[in-house]
Amino acid sequence: MLIYIHGFNSAPGSFKARLVGARMHALRREREYAVPALPHRPAEAMALLCDLVEQHPGSALIGSSLGGYYATWLAERYALNVVLVNPAVRPHELLSGSLGPQKNLYTGAEYELTAQHIDELRALDVAAVTPGRYFLLTRSGDEVLDYRLAVEKYRGAQQWVIPGGDHGFGDFENYLDVVLAFCGVVD
């Protein structure tokens, strides 16, 4: 199973999730692809992801932004391979300045980002990673996250730091073949 883990205030309908889904469909492997709609509470999101991974042992993960943070915790707990796309490294620090009302731009759902969310994120922090499990795909022009934090966190992992670009990784389709190869979907 290939599991795509979307980011903060995102959803299964995100650009990159749809691209991966379309490619899996073209490969006639859509039944091997899952994009769960994650709850905004980190503990609830992680419970949902753990259930999915436990139902499909040996899954590969693609984690984008906050989804990369979640994927890192899952990779270390379940020994999974992960492609990280502009991953959040310390979201508990980044989001602590954004407490208050939030709106998911894809679903329209509104909620309050609280200190409890931050505490739940902090509890998922992984101090040291197993580099061979990861392929980091990041853009130096990411306007939301400092790509250098990911380069440092995943030192020793396969890394592609692509100059310029932005957090949304608008040309993700150009890298889809290598992403799917790392995940074991294609040769």
Over which residues does each language-model region extend?
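Active-site catalytic motif of lipid deacylating hydrolases and related acyltransferases
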Residues: 1-56
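Gly/Ala-rich beta-loop-alpha elbow adjacent to hydrolase catalytic centers
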Residues: 62-71
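Active-site glycine-rich loops that stabilize anionic/oxyanionic intermediates
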Residues: 6-10, 65, 140
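Aromatic pocket-lining residues of Rossmann-like dinucleotide-binding sites
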Residues: 74-78
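Active-site phosphate/pyrophosphate- and oxyanion-stabilizing loops and adjacent acidic/basic residues
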Residues: 18, 22, 72, 148-151
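Short active-site oxyanion
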Residues: 57-60, 133-135
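The alpha/beta-hydrolase serine catalytic core
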Residues: 81-187
